[in-house]
Structures are given as C-alpha cells and as structure tokens.
Amino acid sequence: MRKLRCEWEKTLEGAANRGVKQRAYDALRGLQQCRFEGGDRVSVSTSHARTGYSPEAVAEHAMALAMAVNRHLHKAYMRVRENNFSLQGLTGMNFYGKTAGIVGTGKIGAAMARICHGFGMKVIAYDMYQSPDLDFVTYVELDELLATSDLISLHCPLMESTHHMINIDTINKMKDGVILVNTSRGGLVKTDDLIAGIRERKFFGVGLDVYEEETQNVYTRTARMTS
C-alpha cells in the first residue's frame, strides 16, 4: 500500500507542476482509495466525477456473485473442464421464498432489493433513511437482519460508523449457512474475522468484489481458500 501511495504522490506532484488544479474520480470509486500523504503538499483538490454509472449493473453483479456462490458455479466450471460431470457437492438452495437482507438502500441497494424481490425472496433492509419507493421492503434493525437473512448484500458507504461493520460479533449473529455478498467497500468487512468465519464454516459461501487490503490478503493468505 505504501508503494502505491508513493506512485500516486509522484503522479500528483507531476500533475501539479504542470498546472493541474483538480482531480476527479468516477463515482464508483470511494475517495478513501485515493487518499495519500502527498495531497497535503500540493494544491490539487479531489472530487467525484458524477458520471452516468449504472446502479442496476452493480446490483446485477452482486446477484451474479450470489448465484455463483449458491450454485457453486466456479466448482462446476472447473469440473466440466476436466470432463467431470458429477453433481456431488454442487447442490445449492432455491432463493425463492428465502430472505434477502439488504444493508443500505441507496440506488444500488434499491436495485438489488428489486432483483431479490423478482426472485420471489422476502426482502428486508437496514438503513438510517427508509426509501418510500420500496414498498415491498420491510426495514428492520441490523441485528434482526443478520439473524434472519439467508442472503446478506452490503450496499453502504465506508464511513467511521460502518468501518468493519462485518466483524466477529456481527458474523456470530448471522444464521448458519448464510451467503454474504460485498460489492460496496472492502473496509466494511474485517478481513481476519471473515476468514475465521469461513474456516469455521459459518457461511454457505461469500462473494466479494472488493477487499480491505488487496495486496496483503487476496493473493497470499486467501489464495487457497476457494471452495
């Protein structure tokens, strides 16, 4: 991470020397991913570029991860490549009639809620601000969502109040065999606690599109944990 920051510092300083006063990042990238110490030494401000990104695309990706986990698509793919068509260990569950817990019902979370509703799932959600457009959603406290959801999908920003919101305590409150999906921010999940939960088989499966410290965790400690 320090090496990455040094590279960004060089880039920013070079831009400032060429008269750049503003840097903008696309709306899908959290500004916490773009912070580094060099920003204090040069006069280049940072802002979001509110481009026309698709909340539905992110939500569809979240459901794709959930489906891949549920139906063991990664295992099935590898087996078929080896001419192995055994169904042993590939049984999932029907999402129909199950409970989906959506943490954060902004644009992406709301899109995910609609997708889950279309699957015939009961949709519950946790958010400080309840959306009046989601009349099929029941808002509950976080503890209730954790305890009753078969699928939990994270769609909230990374702030001090949400940092490591998925930790050993909240994991222990979840149902055994829950599916957890995170397409929001890696820092929402405490990596060590998640790994412990996976090893203890708390989860049916986990689908992650973001990681807290990718260079430290993804390619080393978790490289052999695919199951």
Give, region by region, the residue ranges found by the protein language model:
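Rossmann-like dinucleotide/phosphate-binding beta-alpha-beta segment
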Residues: 88-176
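Rossmann-like dinucleotide-binding domain for NAD(H)/NADP(H)
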Residues: 47-48, 168, 177-227
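Phosphate-binding beta-alpha-beta segment of Rossmann-like dinucleotide-binding domains, i.e.
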Residues: 48-99, 111-114, 118
